[in-house]
Regions:
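Internal glycine-rich alpha/beta core junctions
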Residues: 1-226
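C-terminal amphipathic alpha-helical interaction region
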Residues: 192, 203-266
Length: 266
C-alpha cells in the first residue's frame, strides 16, 4: 500500500465548490446524455415493433390490424415523441444557459442578461432530472412492449428486440436511478418551478383545433396544483417523499403534453 502524507497538489477549480458545483455540473451533463440515449433506444424499440407487426401475419392479416397490438404501438409512439420533446426542451435551456455563461467570461452581462442566464440555469436544473427520469422509464416501457409484440420470438436472439431490452435497462440505473431523479426533481415541484412552466406553456399560441386538448391539460394542472398544495401543507418530509414520485410524474406528463401541442403547432 502506497500512502502520501502532506503531499502538495494543484487545486482544480475553487475550494468548497467540488460537490456543489463541479460534480453536479458533471452529473447533469451525463444525465442529459442518458436522456438522449433513452430516446434513441426507445426509437429503436418502436421501429422494431412496428416493422414486425406489419410483417407478421396471423389469422389471415398482419397483427398490426389487431386492436391490442395497434394500441400498444400508439402508446409507444406517444411515449417516444413525448420524451423526445422533453429532451429537446431541456437541451434548449442548457444551450441558452451555457451560451450566456460563456459570454459572461469574456464581457460583463447586462442586468437583464444576468437575470436571463439565471432563469435558464434554473430551468435546466429542473428539466434535466425530469428528462432523464421520464425518458429512461419510457424507454424501458417501450422496450418491454417491443418484446411483447414479438411474442416468444422477442425473447430469442433472432430478433434485435432482446438486445434492445437489455440496452434499455441500464438507462434508468446509471448516473442516478429514477428514484434519485425524483429526489432531484421534487424540489422543483414544491417550489412551483414546474407549475410556472405549465402556466408559461398555457399562454403560448397553438393551433385552434388543439385548444380542447390544452383545456384538458389545464384541468390536469389545476388538479396537480391542489395535490401539491395538500401534500406540502403537511410539512412532513417523509410524507412528501412518499408521494414525490407521483407528483414528479404528474408534472412530467403535463409538461410533455404541452410540448407535444407546441411541436404539433410548429
Amino acid at each position: 500500500e502506497l500512502v502520501f502524507r502532506n503531499a502538495k497538489a494543484e487545486l482544480c477549480g475553487d475550494r468548497k465548490m467540488g460537490l456543489i458545483k463541479y460534480v453536479m455540473a458533471l452529473m447533469n451533463g451525463a444525465r442529459l446524455g442518458i436522456a438522449a440515449q433513452s430516446v434513441g433506444v426507445s426509437e429503436a424499440a418502436y421501429r422494431e415493433a412496428l416493422s414486425y407487426a406489419r410483417e407478421r401475419r396471423q389469422f389471415g392479416k398482419a397483427i398490426i390490424e389487431f386492436p391490442a397490438v395497434y394500441e400498444m404501438l400508439s402508446l409507444m409512439k406517444a411515449k417516444l415523441d413525448a420524451s423526445r420533446s422533453l429532451l429537446y426542451e431541456t437541451t434548449r435551456f442548457v444551450d441558452m444557459y451555457k451560451t450566456l455563461e460563456d459570454i459572461s467570461k469574456e464581457s460583463k452581462l447586462e442586468k437583464e442578461e444576468r437575470a436571463e442566464m439565471k432563469m435558464y440555469q434554473k430551468q435546466a436544473d429542473a428539466f434535466t432530472p425530469l428528462a432523464k427520469g421520464m425518458g429512461s422509464e419510457f424507454c424501458n416501457q417501450n422496450a418491454y412492449d417491443c418484446v411483447q409484440i414479438h411474442g416468444g420470438s422477442g425473447f430469442m436472439k433472432d430478433y434485435a428486440c432482446e438486445r434492445i431490452y437489455r440496452d434499455a435497462r441500464i438507462t434508468s440505473i446509471y448516473e442516478g436511478t429514477t428514484q434519485l431523479q425524483v429526489v432531484a426533481a421534487i424540489r422543483h415541484v414544491t417550489t412551483g418551478t414546474y407549475l410556472n412552466m405549465m402556466k408559461l406553456y398555457e399562454s403560448q399560441e397553438i393551433s385552434p383545433d388543439l385548444i380542447p386538448l390544452r383545456n384538458r391539460l389545464k384541468t390536469m394542472a389545476e388538479t396537480y396544483e391542489r395535490i401539491v398544495t395538500k401534500v406540502t401543507e403537511t410539512k412532513d418530509p417523509e410524507y412528501i417523499d412518499f408521494h414525490a414520485r407521483r407528483m414528479v410524474e404528474m408534472a412530467g406528463h403535463i409538461i410533455m403534453g404541452h410540448l407535444l401541442l407546441l411541436d404539433t403547432t410548429r
